[in-house]
Amino acid sequence: SGSCSLKTCWLQLADFRKVGDALKEKYDSAAAMKLNPRGKLVQVNSRFNAPTIHDLVYIDPSPDYCVRNESTGSLGTQGRLCNKTSEGMDGCELMCCGRGYDQFKTVQTERCHCKF
């Protein structure tokens, strides 16, 4: 009589935040490329290391997400609320694209529906 061992492997996606952070990091460090006269992709700036198979590359630059662009569907960032103390994507420094921002305070009164 023989015994049979069973091995099950599970593939699971990483945490959504980790995947997003990794993609953003690759996007931020993507290499600008152009086609040479022979139709081969070459780096725009040869001072940087050549991209590997794990790096992102691009030919056309990303649109300016700070300004409204109807052809790309970007609404821009003008008029959006930002968080003055945040260093993240919702922070005023990043979201306002260096244009400055207006500050205001609001007082909001809410009924708490407390029971004693």
Curated annotation (Swiss-Prot):
This is Protein Wnt-5a. PANTHER family: PROTEIN WNT-5A (PTHR12027:SF33), WNT RELATED (PTHR12027). Disulfide bonds join C82-C97. Palmitoleoylation is required for efficient binding to frizzled receptors. Depalmitoleoylation leads to Wnt signaling pathway inhibition. The keyword Membrane does not apply. GO terms for molecular function: cytokine activity; frizzled binding. Glycans are attached at N69, N83. It is found in: Secreted, Extracellular space, Extracellular matrix; Secreted. GO terms for biological process: canonical Wnt signaling pathway; cell fate commitment; neuron differentiation. Belongs to the Wnt family. Signal peptide: none annotated. A lipid is attached at S1 (O-palmitoleoyl serine). GO terms for cellular component: extracellular space. Keywords: Developmental protein, Disulfide bond, Extracellular matrix, Glycoprotein, Lipoprotein, Secreted, Wnt signaling pathway. SMART domains: WNT1. InterPro entries: Wnt (IPR005817), Wnt_C (IPR043158). It comes from the Eukaryota. Its main location: secreted. Ligand for members of the frizzled family of seven transmembrane receptors. Can activate or inhibit canonical Wnt signaling, depending on receptor context. Required during embryogenesis for extension of the primary anterior-posterior axis.
